[in-house]
Amino acid sequence: MLKDLNKVRNIGIMAHIDAGKTTTTERILFYTGINRKVGETHDGGATTDWMEQEKERGITITSAAVTCFWDNNQVNIIDTPGHVDFTVEVERSLRVLDGAVAVFDGKEGVEPQSEQVWRQATKYDVPRICFVNKMDKLGADFYFTVGTIEDRLGAKPLVMQLPIGAEDNFDGVIDLLEMKALTWRGVTPIGTEATVEEIPAELADRAAEYREKLLETVAESDEELMEKYFGGEELSIAEIKAAIRKMVVNSEIYPVYCGTAYKNKGIQPLLDAVVDFLPSPLDLGETKGTDVKDPEKVLTRKPSDEEPLSALAFKIAAHPFFGKLTFVRLYSGKVEPGEQVLNSTKNKKERIGKLFQMHANKENPVEVAHAGNIYAFIGLKDTTTGDTLCDANAPIILESMDFPDPVIQVAIEPKTKSDQEKLGVAIQKLAEEDPTFTVHLDDESGQTVIGGMGELHLDVLVDRMKREFKVEANIGDPQVAYRETIRKPVESLSYTHKKQTGGSGQFAKVIITIEPYAPEADELEEGESAIYKFENAVTGGRVPREYIPSVDAGIQDAMQYGFLAGYPLVNVKATLEDGAYHDVDSSEMAFKLAGSQAFKEAVAKAKPVLLEPIMSVEITTPEEYMGEVIGDVNSRRGQIASMDDRAGAKLVKAKVPLSQMFGYVGDLRSKTQGRANYSMVFDSYAEVPANVAADVIAERNGTAS
């Protein structure tokens, strides 16, 4: 564990699925001495892919944290998933990183998920270097890939190396800093060092051209260097590196390297670049947070052991022996096992049991956790993703993370009673780990409904329930939660509930008026509902005071099952105007039944209509797919609200019925070759068009043809 923070790098490896980032990580681990045997994703042996599902699918689902060393520097690596369904893993790892390596496929260039991950990294202002991988692949084109970084990402790539050959003839790279060739000729077993050679004659002119571009970029970044360079003086390697580092830390440029991780070519220079150009915790300076008592007041913490403790929990993972592992980025201060800390987000004290640095799913115990590093804590009971841990005497709340709401939901039903109990435990554990996994009980269907970021996301979660928690369950389709309301008032409807069966009977008479009700939020008194209001207008004691709440309760009961299709009624105001009672036969139950029946009869005359949930949808798409995307939204009964530019793409905002959004994830991907993504949140309820309502009602009532 290094205490010199200048020599610490907290980095992520990010890319589109199949660009080779896990293989790149495996090679880094080998060259830094962590792995004696290298793992491959295609045979299920990769160190960072340690979940059963990852080994089977050959993709990275959870971001595993690994610590390694290179050239006397400590590198903490987070390997992030490239599949869009696991966007939460990318989001939370980027939040705690200081820098990242973006891996691109040398043939495909910038791919859809590369765009999305790049946007996420830009959101958190994470400095990046680029690695063009798979240069040995048929059709690999380094210059095309660099062009896509500029065009698709709107980024400024700084070419640091040129490839020597391509496809089967990829033999190495030209280092544009040292102006030397680094070659790995032929079959290169893992661990093969590069041979340093002169630049091949046929590439000398191109190398000189790109070296000139590099030096011009460096010179333009600094007035002193500009005078020196354009005055004909030579810039030293140290000056060039310092200028590049400064621009990288400020996210002004993105150095580009190349190689083939699988064939063991180009990894060592990439590691040198991580150390040379990506920032240390000290480069990024103070971390900002807010005062617990005054959210408007900004507090800062320097990356130092001497500062009060401030840390962010960015991931929860289940561990077979220790229970819950909480992955934490320590921004300031230090902490030891057994110490008590404050979870300022929840205002709860937590005691730290053990401290580990992780190597994928292996734990290395540490005695002290230092500022600027990433650790796994054991023993935290109440802490969840996004919570701040701090010194109780100097409380602070760090900026948390934004997690998108689930975009797909399915009903899940345990097969047996014993599965029912295990399902509850499984859901609780998985929800702790994953903020984008939601669960709720559908009051109308009685089903447990789980939500996530896509079909693969839910597949993996259901698979984990089976494997880890031994839960057998049936997965179904959820129903849209429709509602009903009324469109016209019905005045003074009289209903008498009368029952005589010997002895004391039942008697209650009510006269009610119902009307549509949709108040603005600022019109509501504290505790009032926006979807129902009851008013008592009875005078002269014609309905005794003690029976008034029973009428209200009866109406609320009746509202649970609407007139058209049995969906709950909303946005109704009911007024009790008059009534009558009997000294002996009236009771709370009689008035409750009278209120309920009167309301049902009134609703039947009040022009009842069906309402459906409308979602506010945001779609980010490359401009060339705008026509397809908008046409598709319109075909789903959607209404376009706005279209704006965003980070080299277009942002479409629309209102679309939820019933039309099932299967959208797949449709959007296929229409845009996977290059668009979307999020949606509930917006409001709106009336269902008559022709659609007729079908919904018929299906609900079992009369569909």
From Swiss-Prot:
State any single GO MF term: GTP binding
Statement: the UniProt record of this protein carries the keyword Glycoprotein:
no
The Gene Ontology CC terms held by the record are:
cytoplasm
* Top-level taxon in the UniProt lineage: Bacteria
List each copy of the tr-type G domain by range: 6-282
Task: Please explain the role this protein plays, according to its UniProt record.
Answer: Catalyzes the GTP-dependent ribosomal translocation step during translation elongation. During this step, the ribosome changes from the pre-translocational (PRE) to the post-translocational (POST) state as the newly formed A-site-bound peptidyl-tRNA and P-site-bound deacylated tRNA move to the P and E sites, respectively. Catalyzes the coordinated movement of the two tRNA molecules, the mRNA and conformational changes in the ribosome.
What family does this chain come from, according to its entry? Belongs to the TRAFAC class translation factor GTPase superfamily. Classic translation factor GTPase family. EF-G/EF-2 subfamily.
| Protein name as annotated | Elongation factor G
Source organism = Corynebacterium glutamicum (strain ATCC 13032 / DSM 20300 / JCM 1318 / BCRC 11384 / CCUG 27702 / LMG 3730 / NBRC 12168 / NCIMB 10025 / NRRL B-2784 / 534)
Query: Gene of origin?
Result: fusA
